[in-house]
Amino acid sequence: MAVKIKLTRLGKIRNPQYRIIVADARTRRDGRAIEVIGRYHPKEEPSLIQIDSERAQYWLGVGAQPTEPVLALLKITGDWQKFKGLPGAEGTLKVKEPKPSKLDLFNAALAEAESGTTAAATTPKKKKAPKKDEAAEAPAEAAEAPAEAADAASES
């Protein structure tokens, strides 16, 4: 029986996601698989390529023929070079940086809040009210002084 390593398509329109499978060469594209050995998501940045290297090596060793797209993926992961005994078995696969967990982000923000900035606001508030009060107090004091003098004169 001729065995091929090929892709089966999953996902929505314009968002393809593939499984890398081992299947009989006569089965249709999304037909019955002998074994699923990986997955490929081309729309992610960088593309997600996960292949079970041990199982891929086994199937290549027993004569399974990869299709052209799968061959390209095997070269990226380094499995094809490993199978053929060529240099570059580490592959050229780019791995996405893991996102920090929400708990780590929360703890970092909490530590920053506890250790940090209890100073005044960065933008100083406008001090319009004291200027108006000083200007209003000066004429009021001037008006009170003659009135006090008049009160003192009338009491004596």
Curated annotation (Swiss-Prot):
Sequence ranges of Low complexity compositional bias: 113-123, 137-156
Pfam families: Ribosomal_S16
GO MF assignments: structural constituent of ribosome
Region annotation (Disordered) ranges: 113-156
An example Gene Ontology biological process: translation
Keyword annotations: Ribonucleoprotein, Ribosomal protein
InterPro entries xrefs: Ribosomal_bS16, Ribosomal_bS16_CS, Ribosomal_bS16_dom_sf
GO cellular component: cytoplasm; small ribosomal subunit
Keyword Ribonucleoprotein among UniProt keywords: yes
Keyword Transcription regulation tagged: no
The family this protein is said to belong to: Belongs to the bacterial ribosomal protein bS16 family.
PANTHER family membership: 30S RIBOSOMAL PROTEIN S16 (PTHR12919), SMALL RIBOSOMAL SUBUNIT PROTEIN BS16M (PTHR12919:SF20)
Protein name: Small ribosomal subunit protein bS16
Native species: Mycolicibacterium smegmatis (strain ATCC 700084 / mc(2)155) (Mycobacterium smegmatis)
Organism taxonomic ancestry: Bacteria, Bacillati, Actinomycetota, Actinomycetes, Mycobacteriales
Originating gene: rpsP
